Amino acid sequence: KRRTQQLRSTPEVLNSSQHSLQRAQFSRYAVNIVERLQNAGYQAYLVGGCVRDMLLNITPKDFDVATSATPEQVRAEFRNARIIGRRFKLVHIHFGREIIEVATFRANHPQNDEEEDSNQSSRNESGRILRDNVYGTLEEDAQRRDFTVNALYYDPVSERILDYANGVHDIRNRLLRLIGDPQQRYQEDPVRMLRAVRFAAKLNFGIEKHTAEPIRELAPMLREIPSARLFEEVLKLFLSGNASDTFEMLVDLELF
């Protein structure tokens, strides 16, 4: 039986005394967006790579915000906002050369066609997600994220971290772990196998054994991915500054 990383129904809340983050470390524009959305009555957090990297004392390349506000509601709050994307709508808020990406909380995908709205979300016969436009709650947003270390939500107003998946623990142990059942998550999006290698090499993390286990068997699924997306992901793999480690890991996991 495969072991899966399940999420808590309520997050572990880490107060400022329990972590190293300070709001002044983050982009003032991103912090301002969170404050304005919260003041307008929405939930809003800094999320993902910027929180992970800050906990590792790495300077983030960008800052992302997750919110309960829909793209249209976000645009109504910011004159300098533009809605982009078809597969999943995002908002880009421009501050000179800096762009902050704001995403609405996203929900899990129902497993059978009878449960889902085909206009919003669909999968092919192997389980790969084809379209992805289902909004959800904060808890659902955490559930659909790929790795525990990317499922951390930082509130710069209260300076608290919300941790649904023991992500802070995995960061401290330098371990990359998928949320949910690894085989199912790779089938939903085979590119996650390449992302596992990229993050492990970039962050100098080990890949948790249950996360690594299905990769060799499922590697052929990458042939289903559109060549443009695959090319983009391979570029990210080899341009992240860890090409040698990346190549060794790709060969070891039979992805190359």
PLM feature spans:
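Catalytic cores of the polymerase beta-like nucleotidyltransferase superfamily
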Residues: 1-256
